[in-house]
Design a protein with these regions (language model features):
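A short, N-terminal "cap"/entry segment at the start of jelly-roll beta-barrel domains
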Residues: 1-42, 47-49, 150-178
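A short beta-loop-beta micro-motif enriched in histidine and acidic residues
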Residues: 33, 44-58, 74-75, 101
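Short histidine-centered beta-strand/loop micro-motifs
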Residues: 40, 48-53, 70, 78-79, ...
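Conserved metal-binding segment of the jelly-roll/cupin
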Residues: 41, 79-101, 109-110
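A short beta-strand-loop-beta hairpin characteristic of the jelly-roll/cupin
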Residues: 52-83
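Short, flexible, mixed-charge glycine/proline-rich loop motifs
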Residues: 111-121, 149-157
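Short cysteine-rich clusters marking metal-coordination/redox-active sites
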Residues: 123-128, 162-165
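Short, non-ligating residues that shape and space the ligands of small metal-coordination modules
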Residues: 134-137, 171-172
Length: 178
């Protein structure tokens, strides 16, 4: 990566808010970095999936609030962050970042392209926390690679139906094919 001049992150956010739109609302700000994905992520989002990453992720909340739901030994737990709060999320622990309206956060994680590392997306029943579906894949572009998997899950009633209690997770209209 070439040496880049420092820049004012708050100014960058103000100039690029129009790019930070749902459903995921993220923008990689150092695309040419060889080692890290450095993203600004905006809310609101309504993701019901959990992300699996084989490396740690750093969350720093700049504006508003985020709740990072985690799956810890079969139990759903909530990590709440307000502006100024930071959280280092452990590797190999499914997590679901849920951002409030108007929130902005910085997320830093290691690049996985060119490694044997796999990313994963998992969905859990909202009633009993039973795992509904999971998929693991090599990540090459964090702004694009999740979309296909979201569409596959939300367009299948079978995948969204809990085999333990029968609850059906609502389909997300942003990812369903009409």
């Amino acid at each position: 990566m070439a040496i880049l001049k420092p820049f004012n992150l708050n100014q960058w956010i103000d100039e690029n808010r129009h790019l930070l739109k749902p459903p995921v609302g993220n923008k990689n700000i150092y695309v040419d970095s060889e080692d890290y994905i450095v993203m600004i992520v905006a809310g609101p989002n309504a993701r019901k999936d959990y992300h699996y990453n084989e490396t740690e992720e750093l969350f720093y909340q700049l504006e508003g609030e985020i709740t990072v739901y985690v799956q810890d030994n079969g139990e759903k737990k909530a990590m709440k962050l307000s502006a100024g709060d930071m959280y280092l999320h452990p590797a190999k622990t499914p997590h679901s970042p849920n951002r409030s309206e108007g929130s902005i956060g910085l997320v830093i994680e290691q690049k996985r392209a060119g490694t044997n590392a796999k990313d994963g997306l998992l969905w859990f029943c909202e009633n009993c926390n039973n795992k509904l579906y999971d998929v693991y894949f090599p990540l090459t572009d964090i702004e694009k690679d999740f979309l296909h998997h979201f569409e596959h899950f939300y367009n299948s009633k079978d995948l969204r139906t809990c085999t333990k209690c029968g609850t059906v997770m609502e389909s997300d209209p942003r990812f369903t094919v009409k």
